[in-house]
Amino acid sequence: GTEPLMDEAIQKRGYVEVGYCSVMGTHDEVVRSLRPDNWQDNAYLNTWRIYQTINGMEVTGDLDFGVDATFGFTLQDRQQILTNKGEGITMEYGQLYKGDKPLIRLVAINKYAHWNFKPAARVIWDFFRHFSRDMKTKKLMYTE
């Protein structure tokens, strides 16, 4: 289970910030994407909550797919990206902020599994390229 990881995140809450980008495929049969019938104890949601905790952010509670049909809760900077991978295969993403810093980006690939999806690599890089760490203080830095 994720209890040991959550315990570690609770211990470090507020002492460290870590950027995180998660990519899920809505048709992945190995790591199931979020759905109204499976979100409780879902691996994606558990991981997002761990990163929210360690970053000292508000932790997502129960999901409501009426609020957001893909993720079940409100994300900022919500976007959809068309791909050339086939009919209906699009990417959606949004972000969670701590103050004015987007620390967590969540990406869903519609009608696709999550692995080896080259367009997702660009979305991931476009997120992480803004981060660096101050070598003295170890503080996470974010630049536009």
Residue ranges and their predicted role:
Residues I109-N110, F117-E144:
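Catalytic active-site module of serine/aspartate enzymes centered on a nucleophile-bearing elbow/loop
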Residues G1-D100, A113-H114:
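The feature captures the conserved acid-bearing segment of alpha/beta-hydrolase catalytic domains
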